[in-house]
Amino acid sequence: MKQEINPKGTNRAIAFELWTKSPMPMVTFTKTFDVTRLCKVSRQRSMKFNMLLCWCIGKAASGIEEFYMLPKNGKLYKYDRMAINVIADNIKGGLSFCDVAVNDDLEAFNANYQQLTETISQTCHDILDDKAVIVGTSAVTGTELDSITNQYSGIFTNPFLAWGRYRKGWFKTTLPISFQFHHAQMDGSHAARFLEELQKTINTI
């Protein structure tokens, strides 16, 4: 459910006033994650690495209140559920998009992820959820990347995570992930907390 709320009645009142009309309100943090555990689970359970990472992102984000508030067109909206936007290659050689509902149950999330990505890949029709707050993702696995920035189009204000190919070392596998967020939605402290929670979730999946 999506509901317009008064920013003055939230903890985002000052930030909303300062940043909602900014020509560039987005901030990007980049953190290098230890994804050794994800690679192990992916192999052992025959689950896609990208799906596992998306599940961890949803798990970490869903526990932070600020993720459920989103500024758009000069207004602030509150949501009661969340989904992860996933991009998939389609049969026409282009890209298609789907929103996978956040779910604490990994098996259920995996089944939904597989069904949605397969459907959009074959039909070339996006499957989107306009009633959920969306956390965008993009896996650019054609190369290793240190950071991905400047994704702001002026239209989409939702949080967005992007990454390249993970890096295998002798003792661990690492992956730099860039996290972009609207400053009216959250402060650096909230973003840092999310990134810490994401690493903890990856470690304990």
Can you describe what each PLM-predicted range is?
Residues N90-L145:
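Helical lid/core segments from catalytic subdomains that handle acyl or acyl-like groups
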